[in-house]
Amino acid sequence: MKSELQLRRRDLALLEALALRVRLIGQRQAADAFWHGHCANARRRLGQLASNGMLTRNLVNAQPLPEIIEPVVRWQPGQVAPDAGHVAYQVQHRWKFRALRPTVVYFPTVKTISQFGGSERSQTKLTQITYDLGVTAIWLRYASQNNNTTAMWIGEDILAPTRIREKLPDAALVDQQGQPKLLIEFAGSYGPERIADFHDDAAARGLPYHLW
């Protein structure tokens, strides 16, 4: 009989993030963030977590992410609206010459989502893998700068029930009462109209945002 896997602090941090903060994580992302860049160690441990029903491993096609260092736009109520056309050019230009390539990603299982109090979610579309990896990269960026941010970050799937008939950001940093205090959106390769729509929604609700 297979003995139960003993979860380490690192395992719990990763599983909690996948249940509550982000939808998936790339194997390379996990290695860099949780195993100090040691791919072999990361691959071995992720495989153990998958074998024990906590993660699902998939090989998918995704574009290599551009360097994600800081938001393209930081906006607060009272400031002038960003130039949507200029922002769209910036975010679209960064994807130049980034062809799809095989990428190993890990998803949380229903067991993991339930264990950490996450919300039921629809299956990620293959066409959305690159985008979701971008959201994960943003979360990892915040987490590397401030550990407190990881607890304040609430992902889209957790936010969804509270945003009926409202635009849904990729994530939000929330206060102790669970109210959004900063919206977070990965612009991907958004066009001007979508960027303007996101800004208008945030401005109408008086919420600052970071657009990456």
Q: Which stretches of residues belong to each language-model region?
A:
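Nuclease-adjacent, charged terminal/linker segments that flank catalytic cores
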Residues: M1-S114
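A short, highly charged nucleic-acid-interacting micro-segment common to nuclease
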Residues: F34-W35, E120-V135
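Short, charged, solvent-exposed linker or helix-capping segments at domain edges/interfaces
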Residues: G117-S119, L183
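Catalytic cores of nucleic-acid endonucleases
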Residues: R141, Q179-L182, F186-W212
